[in-house]
Amino acid sequence: MSDQVLSALEHFFLRWQRDGEARRGLPLCEWEADWRSPCELDEPKEGRVAWRPHRRAEPADFTAMNEALELTLHPAAQALFGGWFSRPVPCLYKGLRLEFVLPWNEADLDLLKENLIGHLLMLRKLKRSPSLFIATTRNEMTLVSLDNESGQVWLEWLDSGRRLVLAPSLPAFLERLETLPQ
């Protein structure tokens, strides 16, 4: 499963880069001296830096998080969050505008893990099955999530608990994402 996720994510990033660079060149983001990333391509100019998603040489380790939660994160989630660094990536899924969530650097991965833990503990308190958010939507109460048990990708309404299956797996979801300009 991990290899399928990494391959599908790499193909999505290649499409995103090809489409974006054909339109406007490399994406730029604000440069922060104390928030560096292996995604940064050049030296900053006028407070901005060009960037690209960056595949990690070694996957991130989720052992401590798994042990703390007494829950094993789905292998697709571990591959997704632990395989690449990136800025949030705007995209479309069947007309739904969303921003894919990935860590920018190691410190951001730690923050993402904390947010995922908080999300999982909230779901546990509400007696809902565990899911891991992978993308945001324009509505802050609606997330795109990975079901930790089945690996399905859902549209999840946090306020009502309603869940709608978007794709049978993370690779299937990634293959159907449409790119948007950065």
Curated annotation (Swiss-Prot):
| Keywords from the named record | Cell inner membrane, Cell membrane, Membrane
Q: What is its main location?
A: membrane
Pfam families for the chain: Syd (PF07348)
Bilayer topology reads: Peripheral membrane protein
Q: Which GO CC annotations does the UniProt entry carry? A: cytoplasmic side of plasma membrane
- Output the InterPro entries linked to this UniProt entry: Syd, Syd_sf
Superkingdom, natural source: Bacteria
Q: Which CDD domains match?
A: Syd
Q: Where is this protein localized, as stated in its record?
A: Cell inner membrane
UniProt KW Coiled coil keyword = no
Q: Sorted alphabetically, which NCBIfam families does this protein's record hold?
A: PRK04968.1
Family listed:
Belongs to the Syd family.
| Function, as annotated | Interacts with the SecY protein in vivo. May bind preferentially to an uncomplexed state of SecY, thus functioning either as a chelating agent for excess SecY in the cell or as a regulatory factor that negatively controls the translocase function.
What this protein is called in its record is: Protein Syd
* Gene symbol of the encoding locus: syd
